[in-house]
A protein has these predicted regions:
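S-adenosylmethionine
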Residues: 1-448
Length: 448
């Protein structure tokens, strides 16, 4: 039995897995669907054929192509091969895994569920990659960092001399973090419960309610007692810290204006000890429906969901000045989450960024009306680009003299949240390199 047929310990043979990776990359390019959605769909469809190691291998291969995308394009141009998902994948096999032509020919044999046979021009071009490393001395800094051109200028502005190191961290394997639901359990109790079921975690270094998985394997989180009881949710430590910066208390009226599926809503409900009043609003009904399921499982009783027709919904005007805290977790380019979503680097361009900046400005203008005098607006994104963050806030404050910027460092100290994790004082910024979590930006505005 040859390499293309062998299953070894996997549910699928290597050649079949490679073909599946190629199909999924093509689907990404043709439909614009994100990596997670495509993986989830394929895994569900093939659940009887795939073992956990199959899934991990498929995801790692796709991630490798996406994380090395700009470098692979550079190489394909150098060896004069047209850039397609097929040639990108084959080039990555040689440069990342050190496969040789003979191995690729075995895997690409044109049989059922196998990639088509290598063409003469492909063989000629790919041979020029043998013995080469992924990084070449003639590559520019941005190509080595695999930074898309639409984000290059902004990230260089933010990262400065640390651009290459910060970009490398944005390509590292992400941590898997969880937030403990303190409405029903302590962090120690949840960690022990997970451990008894073979799910090993440790306390997160910055979030007082976070756990981090320390070794792969064990059951899926959804299969654990702690998850079924609503004691724990998946949430990156950085996202947890942004929720803490809101400073929600049980005596307050609080709104999560772009609540989505409710991750930060859940975190704030726990901080409020199920007291006060919490509104989770969004323009997307499907996301709010997912929030409903999560809120019920977590035992949250102080929150209501409200679907908005648009950013300037009439309800916002009617509710003007009613809230102590307004969290705007604004839609953004997601540059801070590239280590989780490497496909998003290549699915956006300058036009998309400009549209997001315009939408963020509109959301700021609308949602800030909800804050009462002395209340606070917390603006946050999972982007690291200045046009979505610092410059967005500077423009807002210039046009709105009824708000002032509070120093994030002072707010952090006021809330007694421990060591301040950001290198900025007025603004709050986290990066994978500096904090080992997703990249986030946040700031605190006070209504005068």
């Amino acid at each position: 039995m040859n390499d293309s047929q062998a299953k070894s310990a996997y549910g699928l043979g290597r050649a079949a897995r490679l073909n599946l990776v190629w199909e999924m990359l093509n689907e990404m390019g043709e439909t614009g669907r994100n990596m997670d959605a495509i993986l989830s769909s394929r895994f569900k469809h093939l659940q009887d054929s795939l073992e956990r190691r199959d899934r991990r291998d498929l995801e790692n291969r796709i991630r490798s192509v996406l994380l090395n995308y700009r470098k692979l394009l550079w190489w394909l141009k150098k060896i004069k091969l047209a850039p397609t998902m097929r040639t990108l994948l084959l080039a990555d096999m040689i440069l990342s895994e050190k496969s040789d032509i003979a191995q690729l020919e075995k895997l690409c044999n044109g049989a059922h569920n196998r990639m088509d046979m290598l063409r003469k021009e492909e063989i000629a071009g790919l041979k020029r990659l043998l013995g080469q490393d992924m990084i070449h001395e003639d590559m520019s800094e941005a190509v080595i960092a695999d930074c898309p051109q639409w984000a290059e200028q902004g990230l260089k502005e933010v990262f400065g001399d640390h651009f290459t190191e910060e970009m490398r961290a944005l390509g590292n394997k992400p941590t898997t973090d969880f937030r403990v639901n303190t409405l029903h359990a302590s962090r120690d109790n949840v960690r022990e419960s997970l451990s008894q079921q073979g799910f090993k975690t440790e306390n997160t270094p910055l979030s007082p309610v976070g756990l981090r998985q320390i070794q792969p394997g064990g059951p899926l989180l959804s299969e654990t007692d702690a998850f079924r009881k609503g004691w724990v949710e998946v949430q990156d430590e950085g996202s947890q810290l942004v929720a803490h910066l809101v400073g929600a208390k049980k005596s307050m009226q609080v709104i999560d204006f772009c609540a989505g599926a409710g991750g930060k809503t859940l975190a704030m409900a726990a901080q409020m000890e199920n007291g006060g009043h919490l509104v989770a609003s969004d323009v997307h009904s499907k996301r709010l429906q997912r929030a409903k399921v999560r809120l019920k499982r977590a035992g949250v009783v102080n929150a209501e969901r409200r679907q908005l027709e648009n950013t300037f919904d009439k309800w916002v005007k009617k509710s003007k000045g009613k809230f102590d805290r307004v969290l705007i977790d604004a839609p953004c380019s997601g540059t801070g989450t590239w280590r989780r979503n490497p496909d998003s680097k290549w699915s956006k361009d300058e036009t998309d960024l400009a549209e997001l900046v315009k939408l963020q400005s509109e959301i700021l203008q609308s949602a800030t009306r909800l804050a009462k005098s002395g209340g606070r607006v917390i603006y946050a994104t999972c982007s690291l680009l200045p046009e979505e963050n610092e410059r967005q806030i500077e423009a807002f404050l210039k046009a709105n003299d009824t708000f002032k910027l509070l120093k994030a460092k002072d707010v952090w100290a006021e809330l007694d949240l421990g060591d301040y994790p950001s290198r900025l004082e007025s603004y709050f910024r986290l990066t994978p390199l500096q904090n080992n979590c997703d990249g986030f930006f946040a700031c605190v505005l006070e209504k005068l």
